[in-house]
Amino acid sequence: MKCTAREWLRVTTVLFMARAIPAMVVPNATLLEKLLEKYMDEDGEWWIAKQRGKRAITDNDMQSILDLHNKLRSQVYPTASNMEYMTWDVELERSAESWAESCLWEHGPASLLPSIGQNLGAHWGRYRPPTFHVQSWYDEVKDFSYPYEHECNPYCPFRCSGPVCTHYTQVVWATSNRIGCAINLCHNMNIWGQIWPKAVYLVCNYSPKGNWWGHAPYKHGRPCSACPPSFGGGCRENLCYKEGSDRYYPPREEETNEIERQQSQVHDTHVRTRSDDSSRNEVISAQQMSQIVSCEVRLRDQCKGTTCNRYECPAGCLDSKAKVIGSVHYEMQSSICRAAIHYGIIDNDGGWVDITRQGRKHYFIKSNRNGIQTIGKYQSANSFTVSKVTVQAVTCETTVEQLCPFHKPASHCPRVYCPRNCMQANPHYARVIGTRVYSDLSSICRAAVHAGVVRNHGGYVDVMPVDKRKTYIASFQNGIFSESLQNPPGGKAFRVFAVV
């Protein structure tokens, strides 16, 4: 007997055992038919996909996926002491949408996998809500044995008695507090050698990434007893919770349908590759903190009402006639570079100088040092001091809070040398919080890669500590997902700049 596509149900999840997938007879497939009919024209042909103004997931599906994740995370056993409330992230949604459009039954793209977690699900035949797959991921718990603290010496064992448990562990990974998903309709999708004519493909991306080898998915203990300080002691239904975090949703230009139409291949002459995905959110910044100045430039000329920290002086300033007023504290009409030579920060070969504005001084003392005679002045005026620019090599985990936190009126950080491959660093220990302006809890080097001031092969970075911000915005740039943060207690901020 011949069975049509409507009469069969196929349901699977990535990383199940690679074997033939059982089929079940479905007597009624009208729900899926109605859903798919919205994508056909009068002749029964599939529409060509429109420009991307819509999203590949509805508000209802978004909310149901999010609610189910938080419900499942709140009821883990043994109980979790540090399980964080999960929120929706539009950048993760966009990356999930991009991968869902590829219709490839594998994790990807490879450029993102070091920094995100990912669960996949697919079915065809009878309609299934996306929460069907979320629940199936969680149901792997029956095969998972939680590693208690006394078993972790120092690494925790991973015990899974079934085909796979990593979907479950990603769903309940305590620090994975952001999720974004997308749904796509894939024609003739290859699922482990079987061709599914109309596969409904669900991709969910998570950040920070879970499933780190040697770690338990969460800490066992009384709920909310080990929440990170950034949550301020907030707890909601056994989850670490910060007031207001559940009320933010990204703005939608237009409501979308449940299944995204696959783009026609007829009009697309460009073959997309994995490298296309890695460069979609590429950001490059050549903005420098260090300003190149001449021997004659005075701080008063170069710095009016802006934050001026670091200058690059040319060689030969000993021969300049530009005046310098004061000693130790220099008057604002002094030459920046000649004041630096006078104080001994640089020599006649030039170099970098850090400047700190010091407010008004009642007088300035003349002196002769390092071949430069300064002028005395017994009149109140604004002043500045000079200091040496040091260079320090750091790790991918080093933060501004550790190295050079902001202190009023200003702080100077050494010029930082970042190592290679910070994109692949563990985002739990090398967080990136913010966009353009970053929380000082962030990894300096991963923030620099995110901002585009240095590539993944490492290099020099200038860091400017600044006062705290009320809001840090999440984004996906250069292969790194940054976190959002609202009203952090106490912490300061920083910016990163290129060294050219």
Curated annotation (Swiss-Prot):
Basic and acidic residues: bias regions: 254-280
Source organism superkingdom: Eukaryota
Disulfide pairings: 295-313, 317-337, 396-418, 422-445
Region entry Disordered, spans: 254-281
Key words of the record: Disulfide bond, Repeat, Secreted, Signal
UniProt keyword annotation of Disulfide bond present: yes
Domain LCCL: 289-384, 390-492
SMART domains (alphabetical): LCCL (SM00603), SCP (SM00198)
One Pfam family matching this protein: CAP
Name this polypeptide is given: Cysteine-rich secretory protein LCCL domain-containing 1
